[in-house]
């Protein structure tokens, strides 16, 4: 399926596709994304697509936007994948793309906040090696990019 998934940077012209994606999400999905039920406006979609104070990437399957991920200047990111396209690795691909973008931008840390019941996001965080902290009403995931590279290098190093 990964061959059919296209990850690309959003452009201002993508706002309608982003708006359609968010309007196709269930109330539960919107609650998990925003921590409360919120339906985005056209203006919200235009802001997401603008890349003004963040960078947004889209996941497309057969030309249809099925996922969106935004990375902010402080390293915090958000992610949403339409329910019908979960378990295909789209969320993981989007987060990996954000990690690479963060490295290119010189960020030392990427992080996310989610609700304890957002198991898909928690699974992605664990799979990619985020340090996870669980609180009563939220989960915090953090990856120090320089630390991750060091750990990968040490893990691949073999003593003579």
From Swiss-Prot:
Keywords: Acyltransferase, Transferase. Changing residue 33 to A: Reduces acetylation activity, affinity to albA1 11-mer peptide and has no effect on acetyl-CoA affinity. Changing residue 42 to Q: Modestly reduces acetylation activity. InterPro entries: Acyl_CoA_acyltransferase, GNAT_dom, MshD_Acetyltransferase. Changing residue 29 to A: Modestly reduces acetylation activity. It catalyses: L-lysyl-[protein] + acetyl-CoA = N(6)-acetyl-L-lysyl-[protein] + CoA + H(+). Residues 5-148 form the N-acetyltransferase domain. Changing residue 78 to A: No effect on acetylation activity. Optimum pH is 7.0-9.0 at 75.0 degrees Celsius. It is an enzyme of class 2 (transferase). Its EC number is 2.3.1.-. It comes from the Archaea. GO terms for molecular function: acyltransferase activity, transferring groups other than amino-acyl groups. Changing residue 43 to Q: Modestly reduces acetylation activity. Pfam families: Acetyltransf_1. CoA binds at residues 79, 81, 87, 89, 91-92, 118, 123, 127. Optimal temperatures between 70 and 90 degrees Celsius. Belongs to the acetyltransferase family. GNAT subfamily. Modulates activity of albA1, the major archaeal DNA compaction protein, by decreasing albA1's nucleic acid binding affinity through acetylation of 'Lys-16'. This is N-acetyltransferase Pat.
